């Protein structure tokens, strides 16, 4: 019993957590805990945990797990229903009730006294009832149903006693007492729970306890005798027999008064409004009787009557003792805890009721149809609960990742209203500590829903504190190297923002668009304060004006990132750095001037200052050498013109004379004959007598050509021909045959004109 109550308490706690939590990991954890618990059909019917789990069927992460768990519990409920005694047909139950009433009327008509009724079975004797009241209900064994194996026709037909039976001999049917359907029938809401149960389920006789003299404090009458009791009240008391005791008359009249005083409620009244009134009526009925306290055996059917109401509808299940499902049994008095334990023992010890729903279920198909009808049942919450439900739903939607439309919200509310009524009501009744914890967890979930990025204004606040003293001590920095928060925050993914991130420890969550894949562009390690300061001074060399007596090894990480011109500008303020930075200039020399060789007796600083002017010096030397080389070279061929002072002749006369001079040349000897003298010329060459007639033709041509010819080109060719003739004369060489042939062809060509 303790294990069952522990399981029930654990299921209720997990149910509340499933209704309040939204994180997938926690939901999966709670579902795993529920699957590990030893679940029974009674716990499922009492808590409604299956419908709470079914609401998670369409969840993105735990939907499959919740669907499998709900299906497994459904099989558990179906197997439990099949193992229980099958439900009876309503028509069959009504016929059995009519048969019992007719049998009692026949016994009264025969004149059977109260103490001379047929012998009862041991289970229906008063001694057995007193023993059963002292024995815990869990140790009692349910009585076998002897009539369930009889055919339907035999159960409907009454058995007639034999004719030779005596006056006080019971009929064969009375030897095996008729049992009414176990469990409560769907009684009217206004009736008392005690009248809704038959005594066959409690191990009692068909007649009320008051008729048999039992000291019961409640006048319990069978629900099947509702119509017959009204007829008995209208009859005179003497017509019912003279053997009835005054106690019987008093008990019946009391029961009739209770039925008349109880107002009839409509059949659609909620269980919340009906069950507290039933509980009060039970107390009043107990006080109207012998004044004894109502035992747990008489209150147990009430709890069994509530289970089908909970499994059929999604209304909140009110407990008789006011127990909060979220708090378990905490905060109850010892008497209430004892009464609650007695109720649970009675529920587990008694055989389960047959009618779990308001409509009888006869097959597995009907069970599935009822289950499908439950899923699409219209919500019937009160106005106050609808207001509370909407507020909780709005809070949950604020923490969600995406907002849905109003139409989607209405559909989701209509589908989830039946499963969330109990969970939200139980969550509303949590203690204040748990409410504060749930609010903190919801706030944490809302924070975790978004991307976990550090806002940029946090870093801007850090640099706002340092802006004043930085401006007081350092020179104004450039816009690209500024570290103040005046710049507008840009997107983290922009490359400009990454370049302008002056603070080295600033985390950049942007991703580089690289072909090899997206990688986070952030530093692997957080830099130290010294590294951050060195980075700032390296990016802002103008801010470091005077270092004073700071050792070089402190400034070395800063100076390594400076350019040579920046080092040169810092020389005027820090003369001590000139000797120390010689090694840095050496590195710059090797980087910028790879082919230069250092000169002796010169520092690397002087070397670097000289090397930028070396290319210009080499260019000037090269230009001077080229110019001197061109001046010393001899001149090449020169074209000179000979100008003759002569009168221009007509082109016709010039062409004629050229032809004549060409014809006078001797092709064999290569000599040119002198031209004919003009008539009347008295001028005689001076050298004509000294040299041979043909031999002196060249000199005569040179003398007379300026006067006779106007073509300067021809005269120049003749001048060159004269020394050639002398050379040939001295050499006495013979003209080549091809040359002679060419000359002859040339002569013939011009002679044809």
From Swiss-Prot:
Chain segments carrying region Activation domain: 500-659
GO annotation, cellular component aspect: elongin complex; nucleoplasm
Composition skew (Basic residues), residue ranges: 306-317
Keywords assigned by UniProt, alphabetized: Nucleus, Transcription, Transcription regulation
Tissues of expression: Specifically expressed in testis.
Quaternary structure annotation from Swiss-Prot or TrEMBL: Heterotrimer of an A (ELOA, ELOA2 or ELOA3P), ELOB and ELOC subunit.
Protein name (database record): Elongin-A2
